[in-house]
Structure formats: C-alpha cells, structure tokens
Amino acid sequence: MNLYFLEADKPLTKTYAKKNGELIKSPYPMTWEFTSHQEQSSDLSSMLSLLNKHAALGHCLLKGVIARPLVRESRAGSTNSNDATDWLCLDLDGLPEHMETKTPSGQTLTTPLTLDLFLNEMGLQDVSYIVQWSASYGISNSRIRAHVFIQLDKPYAAPLIKQWLIQKNHDVDLLRNTMELTKTGNSIRWALDISACQNDKLIYIAPPVLKNIKDPMGKQPRIALVKGKYDILALNGGINTTEKNKQLTHTRINDLRDTAGLIKRKFNYKVVGGTEVLTKPAESVI
C-alpha cells in the first residue's frame, strides 16, 4: 500500500477548550500549502505504525496517490480521481447513537451503537481493521466518530468503491434508516460518507489539542489495530452499477420527501464538460 501523508505549516487538528464552563471549538486550520511524505506499507501492522508516526507530527493522510512530490505548495491537480487504491476508508461521522436489535423472542431493544455492532451490520465482523478515533470523539457525546481502514485484496478504482459505499447505504438497514434529506430537500445526507473514497480526500488523523478538558480516550490508544479472521477484504458479491444506485437514490429521496410532506421530484441529467449534472434543480437558499 502506497500511503501519502501531508504536512502543513501548523498541526492539522482541532482544538477544544473549556472556559467558564463553555466548550470552545477551533476547527481544522485552513491551509493551502503542503509538503508530501510518501510511505510504503505491506500490511495493516506497518500501516498502524505509519499512522501513529504521522499523527504525532500533526500530519493528515491523503486517500489517493500524488502524481508528484509536494514541497510547500498547493495540492491542486496533484491527484487523479480515477486512480485505483488497495485500501478502504470508512468515515463514520453520521451514524446514530443507538440502534434497535431483536431478541430471540422477537422483542425490540434499543442498544448503544458500538463499532463492533456497526461492522457486524456491514458484514465486516471477521475482517481485520485499524480504527482511528476522530478528534471530536467523546467531546460532546458518545456517538461513533472514527475512521476505519481496511486492506483490500487488490486495487479497485475509486469510482467503483464509491458505488460500493452508496450500495451499502441502501442495503444496510441501519444506514438506510438513518438517511436524511439535505437542507435543499433534493439530495441525501449519507450516514456512511460516500466521499471517503475520493482520491483528493484529506483524512485527519492527528489527536486533538485539549485545554482544560479530560481526554475522553483515557489510556485507550486513539489509533489501534483490531485483528480479525481475515486480513484483507474482497469487494465481491456484485457491486451495483452507477445507474442502479442512481435509481435507488432517487427512490429514497422521493420517499423522504413524501414523509416530509414535499412533492415528488423528477430527476433529469445532462453531461457538461464530461460531468453529469442535474438539470432544473429546485430553488434553494445558500
């Protein structure tokens, strides 16, 4: 696995502070110039060491491959959206705090959603993974906020992985039931981030700066390897086509619009400059 870490002129992390009982949050710094660091990882164990190394330095991880080394410069145009990758990132930031489970007698129970329960719902309970708990995890609530890294059996094109993520959002009841409309009412807020596969995606791995706040992780490592029965994941079993996922998404949007008392929408697209765009979108407020 080729891994690319990016360094900026300041640590790429969030800051949380308590002042007079009020929680003050400082977002990730806005920065445009980066220096890249290329690393080679043969398995998740070596990837774990590299993640810990660069997290301690305040670097972030780039999902894709950089075409050329960066030295204190913009990363614009440095990645190819169609490049293949042999590792998967699950960005968990939109999951519910609880889930419903059934007892053998058929009774419905409300259970706190743990990472193990989520991976079981995804069918990934037997696969080894690295979990990196996000800077915001445990600050305001116990909701899962993490990145999960899984080694793949071979390189897959990033657009194909995106279709796999979209399909999972539709097929896994936990994710499907968590879907919401965006403010415009014309698209979906995905429970499992479908952009985490994009080759230009920055994955923030550095621990937060905490001032007058106890670290919610305690002595638990923020980045850890969890061994499973299988060390790699094959994305087999059939991945939906783009058209199939588009139909599922349109149906789900209209179902949610109906629940919200909105009229159904008809979706039409055209290709502009090689990019498919929605024609005649509804009016929205920005």
For every predicted segment, state its role.
Residues 3-8, 25, 30-56, 72, ...:
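Catalytic "initiation/cleavage/transfer" segments centered on a nucleophilic residue
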Residues 1-146, 150-168, 262-270, 274-282, ...:
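Signature for HUH/AEP ssDNA processing cores
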